[in-house]
Swiss-Prot record:
<feature type="compositionally biased region" description="Gly residues">
    <location>
        <begin position="392"/>
        <end position="401"/>
    </location>
</feature>
<protein>
    <recommendedName>
        <fullName>ATP phosphoribosyltransferase regulatory subunit</fullName>
    </recommendedName>
</protein>
<keyword id="KW-0028">Amino-acid biosynthesis</keyword>
<dbReference type="GO" id="GO:0000105">
    <property type="term" value="P:L-histidine biosynthetic process"/>
</dbReference>
<dbReference type="GO" id="GO:0004821">
    <property type="term" value="F:histidine-tRNA ligase activity"/>
</dbReference>
<dbReference type="InterPro" id="IPR004516">
    <property type="entry name" value="HisRS/HisZ"/>
</dbReference>
<comment type="similarity">
    <text>Belongs to the class-II aminoacyl-tRNA synthetase family. HisZ subfamily.</text>
</comment>
<dbReference type="InterPro" id="IPR004517">
    <property type="entry name" value="HisZ"/>
</dbReference>
<keyword id="KW-0963">Cytoplasm</keyword>
<comment type="function">
    <text>Required for the first step of histidine biosynthesis. May allow the feedback regulation of ATP phosphoribosyltransferase activity by histidine.</text>
</comment>
<comment type="pathway">
    <text>Amino-acid biosynthesis; L-histidine biosynthesis; L-histidine from 5-phospho-alpha-D-ribose 1-diphosphate: step 1/9.</text>
</comment>
<dbReference type="InterPro" id="IPR045864">
    <property type="entry name" value="aa-tRNA-synth_II/BPL/LPL"/>
</dbReference>
<dbReference type="InterPro" id="IPR041715">
    <property type="entry name" value="HisRS-like_core"/>
</dbReference>
<dbReference type="Pfam" id="PF13393">
    <property type="entry name" value="tRNA-synt_His"/>
</dbReference>
<keyword id="KW-0368">Histidine biosynthesis</keyword>
<comment type="subunit">
    <text>Heteromultimer composed of HisG and HisZ subunits.</text>
</comment>
<feature type="region of interest" description="Disordered">
    <location>
        <begin position="373"/>
        <end position="401"/>
    </location>
</feature>
Length: 401
């Protein structure tokens, strides 16, 4: 937008991709925030509140290039050091677990807060999402992956997403094959990009240029086709039967998570994609995304990221998920938290009996709005469907409008 666009008449414009919430959507989101934190607590997850801004070297430690380019940077006027406005809360929570809590036992931590992105992550995506999530530190088994995915699905259902679809992968399969093939970092990166686009011709060309062992080439070439339901894992077992041990272990891990989810969530649609490598520079194992039919991108995502605690001096296995609260409210099947037109319009006054009645109604959970002297608009404009009036005996009663 040109400088001339910012005239006195439109100085109220928000930056592109930056959103604000109005009634009743803001109330709906706040209600969901409370519900999700209560749910996390019921599962044993403790709330942490990292700062909105940190020194850049701490904020980006162990996170990779993607988060770096999404982070707004500025100079601390007190120290002259570079600072960053967080674009993702997960690394901050990992720092808290590794550096501040330093527990031996597993830690279950949850969070919710605003983040800021330098660029939107997709078409019509906000640059100031409200990130909510949960992380489980200190356990490397499939059980913790199953718990995190189950909690993610439960959270989506709490938000009103009745039937999410789950897309599962494991970054260790491609990583193990690429490393066994002796790919350089540049070759691995080029293959990664082509796999994510399922650009088969480009994959063939890259494999030809790399002069890879024929057996490993065949396995890498097959990854874009290894997607679907549980039958995709059966097919992967055949294709990767002679793969390196680490690759076969990654596939067994994927099978273990799938079996656990089928027992816990038998009605949850599962889809597997071995070329699904989101967060490749960050994740180390299982990766997943929750999708909703009719919505163009994931509504929640997560996975395992065992290496991040190492840079804080306390290497711990870790797995977790996150979602944007704004997105959850947008795609939810539920109704607004505060239905329009529900409330009591009370007269203005400071008589003790009137104040006592108003306080009692509010204590019972009623929404009570006092009518200001000389105000424009009646009960409907205030979102009220009843009025507080005095009866013939001087007592206060609510009457429908």
């Amino acid at each position: 937008m040109s400088d001339s666009a910012f005239s006195k008449d439109n100085r109220w414009l928000l930056p592109e991709g930056v959103d604000e919430l109005l009634p009743p959507r803001a109330a709906q989101m706040e209600t969901l925030r409370r519900q999700l934190l209560d749910q996390f607590g019921a599962w044993g997850y403790e709330l942490v509140m990292p700062p909105f801004i940190e020194y850049l070297d701490s904020l980006l430690t162990g996170t990779g290039h993607d988060l770096d380019v999404q982070t707004f940077k500025l100079t601390d006027q007190l120290t002259g050091r570079l600072m960053g406005v967080r674009a993702d809360i997960t690394p901050q929570v990992a720092r808290i677990d590794a550096h501040r809590l330093r527990r031996e036992a597993p830690s279950r931590l949850c969070y919710i807060g605003s983040v800021l992105h330098a660029r939107p992550e997709g078409i019509s995506r906000s640059r100031n999402p409200v990130q909510v999530g949960a992380e489980l530190f200190g356990h490397a088994g499939v059980e913790s992956d199953i718990e995190i995915i189950s909690l993610a699905v439960a959270s989506l259902r709490t938000a009103g997403v009745a039937q999410p679809h789950l897309d599962l992968g494991h970054v260790g399969i491609f990583r193990g094959l690429a490393r066994a093939a002796g790919c350089t970092p540049a070759q691995e990166g080029a293959l990664l990009e082509a796999l994510q686009r399922k650009a088969v011709a480009e994959i063939d060309e890259l494999l030809d240029e790399a002069a890879i062992d024929p057996h490993l080439r065949r396995m890498l070439r097959a990854l874009p086709q290894l997607n679907g339901g549980l039958e995709a894992l059966d097919h992967a077992g055949e294709v990767l039967a002679e793969a390196p041990q680490g690759v076969r272990q990654a596939l067994r891990t994927l099978w273990g998570v799938a079996a656990g989810l089928e027992r816990r969530l038998p009605d949850l649609p599962l889809h597997f994609d071995l070329a699904e490598l989101r967060g490749y520079g960050y994740h180390t194992g299982i990766v997943f995304a929750a999708l909703v039919p009719g919505y163009g991108s994931e509504v929640a995502r997560g996975g395992r990221y065992d290496d991040i605690g190492r840079v804080f001096g306390n290497p711990r296995p870790a797995t977790g998920f996150s979602a944007d609260l704004r997105t959850l409210v947008q795609v939810a099947d539920g109704q607004p938290a505060v239905p329009a037109g529900k409330g009591v319009l009370a007269p203005w006054g400071d008589e003790p009996d009137l104040i006592k009645v108003i306080e009692a109604l509010r204590a019972e959970g009623e929404r009570v709005v006092q009518e200001l002297p000389g105000q424009q608009g009646g009960a409907a404009a205030q979102g009220c469907d009843r009025r507080l009036q005095q009866d013939d005996g001087g007592g206060w009663v609510t009457r429908p409008l």
